[in-house]
């Protein structure tokens, strides 16, 4: 038995380095002003997919992501770890999407890919923390869904057996294929990049990532696998009104950058006088009563 697996992955801003230019005037994320990383829980999802690929010979794993051309790096990171292919949804008409528009775009792409057995993604992205996209994709495709997965244990008789977190413990469930699964950050961590695969795919790019002046450009004709799939709204037969800002009823009004400042401290000795003074100060400021 072989499986066709699609991993939903996202290039996200590194939220440890959010500055004053993080948002645009329209209330969308200014991704060009922020360092970008592979969404952590999507790496957990990728690991589950790669384990299934090893468990069921002949299976394939593809990375599906949406973003600007530089998001092609997410596909490369997947290829370096053992994925077989990838698709980048990139089009100005996809820009500014909330979870509803994002899930619509991903669902139309999955329909174009066709005959998918499992769609696996991280529980949520660190830039939005909504945990909505996976379930929304399942709803739009009319597929079964399992959330908060810790491990995809086996595929047997057309069903996936999944161990998932619940309040106060874990449960094991079965879900008929095809199924959408979202994976927790506490699941098995992603394997490191494979050196041989890095050498094989380091020049793998989408057409919009290239300038045409790369010294390795002649390799593209010799090695077709170095050209990654790049799809626009038209390529996936999408409705422009349901994509990007046009299809996004959610709008971010403001984002505030909170700066924590240390207050002045003082050292209190253990003398009776200092202790009495401290208690009086706390009472006066109504910190204790």
Q: PLM features: what roles do these ranges have?
A:
Residues 1-289:
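N-terminal glycine-rich FAD/FM-binding segment characteristic of electron-transfer flavoproteins
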